[in-house]
Amino acid sequence: ALDDFKLTAIPHEPLAVFLEEHGFNSLLKRLGEGRGSPERKVQLNPAKPVNAGAVVVPGGSRQALAELPPIDRSLYACVQDEEALAGWIERAFAARLVAFDTETSALDAISADLVGISLATGPGQACYIPLSHGGTDMFAEKPRQIELARAIALLKPLLESDAVLKVGQNAKYDLNVLARHGTTVSPIDDTMVMSFDLDAGRSIDGIGGGHGMDELAMRHLGHSCIAFKDVCGTGKKAIPFGEVPLDRATEYAAEDAEVTWRLHRLLKPRLSDEGGTRVYERVDRPLVPVVAQMERHGIKVDREALAGLSATFASEIGKLEGEIHELAGQPFTIGSPKQLGEILFDKLGYKGGKKGKTGQYSTDQSVLERLDGEGAPVASKVLEWRQLSKLRSTYTEALQEAINPTTGRVHTSYSLVGAQTGRLSSTEPNLQNIPIRTEIGRQIRHAFVADQGNVILAADYSQLEVRAD
């Protein structure tokens, strides 16, 4: 009977081991609290640390890495002429696998200038190809380097060859940069996406569960990469990568390529050993170039509609400010938590004010909602003021500034590894948090429009959002 399959008691030991191995600390605590006997620490195999599955790799790939020589930046080559580049291209074709990386003038792949490309075909076998070094001074002497268009023409057969696997770390960025130079990189592997498919949500050996180059290098290779700030500086003293001396630029860029090569050698076998091949090969790897194309294509927005909404919001904000000042009995800076707290609890005398360590009253949303529920009209007005101010600054104004002057579209960046659920997340600008349940939020969403003859389709299946729209 069906009742025979009913789970009457949760088997504690295997569940506790599973929860601890995967970092579900809150659930593990609840499991301990629900037991009749005193809580005890789950004892795993002492020879196998917690989360060892993310570090001790089956299939011998860890051993393969151990057999490699340590990273030696002095072995890297700076490729400054066509003959040397031809040699590296020949080496990549012979290896049938090459790790690659691009260096650019900015983080925005849609507008950044290509400064250089690095390649790696094995341990200690890495190079940097400078393309646009020397700064923008027309009269300054430029370092010897291959002309950009000529270098792309030489590299294009390699980057587009089906006979050579190209490996990137966050390859989507590099695909977008090179696509703007007429090059479609394929086939590709992406070590960042591999790491996400294998270790999403895990905090490993105290290093953290991120999937960036520096974290992966330290976690899996025990290697500390050169930091970008150590190459380009920070603040007012920061320089563009194109002004970094070639010897230093070569160390930084070629290291990225070699680290990517080593990470691929480690992570690729884990996919098959740990059952991750199906998801990676059938879903996430094919999705990388698709999402890259989505970013390049961008989203059309109605600038006039946004400007109109922004003006309406500004008018409403000004009206609310006047009403709030009238209720307070004096003008003050509404956006200042300190001044707002003093008005609410000292001047107007509302009860329940609590001061934090800084000595000022808390005026977060929960406090204002409580006061609103108790009949404080000024709290209601401040909540409305905050909402409109945020919508105006975050969306109606910011989206207008985000419109690319060349394409006339907004080119957001979609992260494949930004959400543990597997959903895409959006940044620069963030498009996923635009309100949908309010009329104001819907007005902002209506500013996103389709090209003439097209429609925007929203797809949903059984209340589960699809990975790509």
Task: Tell where the protein language model's regions lie, with residue ranges.
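Conserved "right-hand" nucleotidyltransferase catalytic core of DNA-directed polymerases
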Residues: A1-E141, S186, I204-G208, L216, ...
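Helix N-cap/beta->alpha junction signal
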Residues: D81, N170-A171, T191, E465
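Acidic beta-strand-to-loop metal/phosphate-binding motif
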Residues: A99, A163-A171, I456-A458
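Phosphate- and divalent-cation-binding pockets in alpha/beta enzyme and binding domains
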Residues: Y173-R180, I343, A468
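Alpha-helical scaffold elements adjacent to nucleotide-binding pockets in ATP/GTP-utilizing enzyme cores
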Residues: D174-V177, G212-L216
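Residue-level signal for well-ordered alpha-helical positions
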Residues: R180-H181, A200, L216, E274, ...
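Conserved beta-strand -> loop -> alpha-helix junction used to position metal-binding or nucleic-acid-contacting
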Residues: T184-A200, G212-E215
